[in-house]
């Protein structure tokens, strides 16, 4: 048996402490290093930085459980990336529109930063958690060089009847 170097994209000096493969998507890897998080979509052939809002800090352990990625850090406590479903659906730089499969949702009556659609929305307060949105949140991928400037999403019931139409047109 022989060793294969799978550190392409992780800088020299970013000593890797932990590597975990996703429990559902083969070849989706997460690496915790001295200089933060990295992700590989191809079994470790190429790594990309994956910090999101996580400060650059040593990552000491990773655990994938209940569809979440839990990150243990050196001096910054634990971080949790909720719902790996979006990452599992990501397919790289696509040239066409793609609607990602939404997670199951519950209709409720509570306040959430995710309920607002305003140009002035600056995100949630750092000192507060965020309640889930009321209803379904749709995520989609739209290529930068798309010729279509308008999007229309039709939501249908189980019989194919349109129950709601959402458009990007003002």
Q: Residue locations for each model-derived region?
A:
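Beta-propeller blade termini and top-face loops
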Residues: 1-126, 133-139
């Amino acid at each position: 048996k022989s060793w294969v170097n799978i550190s392409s994209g992780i800088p020299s000096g970013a000593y890797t402490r932990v590597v975990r493969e996703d429990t559902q998507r083969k070849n989706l890897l997460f690496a915790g290093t001295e200089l933060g998080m990295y992700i590989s979509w191809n079994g470790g052939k190429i790594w990309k930085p994956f910090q999101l809002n996580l400060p650059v800090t040593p990552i000491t352990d990773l655990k994938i459980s209940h569809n979440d990625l839990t990150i243990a850090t050196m001096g910054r406590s634990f971080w949790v990336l909720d719902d790996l479903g979006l990452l599992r659906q990501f397919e790289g730089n696509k040239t066409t529109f793609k609607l990602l499969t939404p997670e199951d949702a519950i209709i409720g009556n509570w306040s959430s930063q995710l309920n607002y659609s305003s140009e002035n929305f600056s995100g949630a307060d750092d000192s507060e958690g965020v309640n889930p949105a009321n209803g379904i949140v749709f995520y989609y991928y739209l290529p930068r060089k798309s010729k279509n400037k308008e999007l229309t999403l039709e939501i249908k019931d189980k019989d194919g009847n349109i129950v709601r139409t959402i458009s990007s047109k003002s």
